Amino acid sequence: MEIEVVDVSRNEIRVLIRGETHTLLSPLVEELNSLDEVEFAGYDVPHPLKEESVLFLRVKEGMNPREVLKGAIRRLMEKYEIIGNSFIEELSSLKVNH
């Protein structure tokens, strides 16, 4: 995965992400849009045959878009770690009958 900040201003950031599309960006945008400090988050896949996406984030006045994005990524990683651990725990307790 390659990440390139295409544009950044006081309360907006646009990031080009190569090597990822909906699998990563859909949950990230959902996480971002759940935050009070976010006015809008969305993404676009400019061409269906290329694994490239553009993430757009606009935050409320006084917030830093880079920091809000980093925080959302951290929270998403924590959520997936919890889900992964719970899944592994459940699988470990299953008894397989042959």
Curated annotation (Swiss-Prot):
Entry's Gene Ontology cellular component terms: cytoplasm; DNA-directed RNA polymerase complex
Key words, A-Z: Cytoplasm, DNA-directed RNA polymerase, Nucleotidyltransferase, Transcription, Transferase
Entry GO MF terms: DNA binding; DNA-directed RNA polymerase activity; protein dimerization activity
GO biological process: DNA-templated transcription
Enzyme Commission number, as recorded: 2.7.7.6
UniProt KW Electron transport keyword: no
Top-rank EC class of the record's enzyme: transferase
Major subcellular location class: cytoplasm
Keyword tRNA processing: no
Catalytically driven reaction(s): RNA(n) + a ribonucleoside 5'-triphosphate = RNA(n+1) + diphosphate
Coiled coil: none
Localization of this protein: Cytoplasm
SUPFAM superfamilies, per database record: RBP11-like subunits of RNA polymerase
PANTHER family, alphabetized: DNA-DIRECTED RNA POLYMERASE I,II,III, DNA-DIRECTED RNA POLYMERASES I AND III SUBUNIT RPAC2
Subunit structure: Part of the RNA polymerase complex.
Protein purpose: DNA-dependent RNA polymerase (RNAP) catalyzes the transcription of DNA into RNA using the four ribonucleoside triphosphates as substrates.
Family of the protein in this entry: Belongs to the archaeal Rpo11/eukaryotic RPB11/RPC19 RNA polymerase subunit family.
Protein name (database record): DNA-directed RNA polymerase subunit Rpo11
Organism, as annotated: Korarchaeum cryptofilum (strain OPF8)
